[in-house]
Amino acid sequence: MVVKGNTSTGTITDFNGTFTLSAPADAILSISYIGFKSQEIAVKGHKDIKIVLQEDSETLDEVVVVGYGVQKKSVVTASIAKVSADDLASTAPVRMDNALKGLASGVTVTSSSGQPGAAAQIRVRGVGTIRTENGAADPLYIVDGMPLEGGLDYLNPNDIASIEVLKDAASGAVYGARAANGVILVTTKTGKIGKTKVTYDFSYGWQSAWKKRDVLNASEYALMINEGAINAGIAPKFSDPYSYGQGTNWQDEVFNNNAPMMNHQVSVSGASEKVNYLFSLGFYTQDGIVGGNFDRSNYERLTLRSNTQYTLFDESKERNWLNSLKVTSNLSYARIKSTNFDDNSTWGTPLGSALALSPILNVYDETEEAIKAQFDKYGTTAEYTPVYDPRNGKLFSIPGEFGEMSNPIAKLSLPGDKHWSHKFVANFSAELQLWDNLKFKTSYGADLSFWGYDSYRPLYYLRSGESSTQSSAYSRKEDGTVWQLENVLT
C-alpha cells in the first residue's frame, strides 16, 4: 500500500490485514495484493478505513512458462513469480536485472554501484550453497530456451514479453544443480495477428544528485582546526579564520548536474496464419552524475533483435498423425560501451575526497609557481607533471597536506578505461506436433561474446603516491562461446 504520487510513503499490513499509515487528508491510497485486483481509495480525512479487495480470477488463467512447457497458473503447484511487459513498462528499467525490483516476491535485487549501466545482484530466496564457476550465487538465466552466461545486460527491456522466476526445488527436476539458486526464464516479444505495427518511442531526461551532505565551509573548517590545535596545546594555524568565507564545496564541484539520458526504441511487428515476426532496434545512452562530464562515467547500449516464426504446415484432414510443423528463429545482437571509475574505495573516489577534502583548498591554482611549491614540499621522486582542466586550460591544485587524497576534479579529468562488449545470441528451433498429445522439439542455440577494454595513461602528478612518470597504453580482448543442442519430447 502506497500513497499515489509518492511511492516513498507506504506500508504493509500485518497477518490480520491491519495497517497504519501517515498520509495527507486528501491523499489517495493505492492498494495491491497478489491474486486480488488493485484498488485506489480516497482518504477524505477519515482516520479509520476499511478496505475489501476483490479476487482477480483472470490471473489464474494466465499462462506461465515452466521448464520445457507452459501451464495455467490455476494448475501450477510450484512457486513461480511472473512479471509481464505491462509491469516492466510501469517502471521503465534500464537493465533487465533492475526490472525485477519490487515486482517479484522472494526475489532480492541490490545495486552496489550507482554508475550508469551498473549491474545489479539478484538473489532468489537468499544465497544458495551451490555457486557458479566464479563463486557467485546467481540464478540460472534462460532466454527463449537458451541458457546464458555473463548476465543479461545485453537484453533490451523493451523486447521482453514476460519474466518467470522459478523459486523452489521443482525447477531442479528440469535444470538440475544449475537451478540451485533459482531460475529466471525470459520470453521475448513476438508479433500479433493483424496489420504490420510500427512503433517508435523516444525519451530524454536529466539526472542530478537528490541530496548532498552538510559539510563545513572554509571559515568553519579553519575555526575547528584552530580549536583542535588549542586543545592540543599548540599555536592556532589560521590567524583569521573568517577571512576564508564559504570556500570550496567539493560536492558542488564533483557532481555533474543535469546529466542527460536518452532512449530510442523502434520496432516492426505483425503476424498472419503462417508467419509471425518482430524486428526491433534500441539505442540508450546515459551520463553519470559523477564524472559524466569528463567521459569517466558513461554508458551506451545498441541492441538489435529479430524474432520470426514460420508455420510450414498445420493440421489437415489428410493426415492423422503429423499435425503441424513450426520453425522459429530468435536472433539478437548487443554492443555496449562504458567508462567508469573505482567507486568502492573510501578515500580514492571522487565522492570520498569531496566529503573529506579541505574547503580552504581551491579547485585551481592561480599560478604554476604555487603548484611547483606544493610539489617541492610534498612531492617524491616523481616527475613534476601538473594536470590542466581540458575544459578551460586552468591548472588544478594539489592538496599537499592531504597525502591520502587527490584533487577529485583533476582525477576525473584524466582518461579512464573504455570498456566494450559485443554479444550475439542465436536460437533456432523446429517444433513438430506428432499427435494431439505428443510434441517433439529440436533446438540449437549459440552465445558468442567478445569483450575487453582500452586504456591510456598520460604523465600526471596528483599527489605523493599517485602519479605517472611515463605514458602507457593498454588493450585487452577476450571472447567466449556457448552452444546448446536440445531435443525434447513432451
Residue ranges and their predicted role:
Residues 74, 193-247, 291-299, 303, ...:
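Surface-exposed loop/interface segments of Gram-negative outer-membrane beta-barrel transport/assembly proteins
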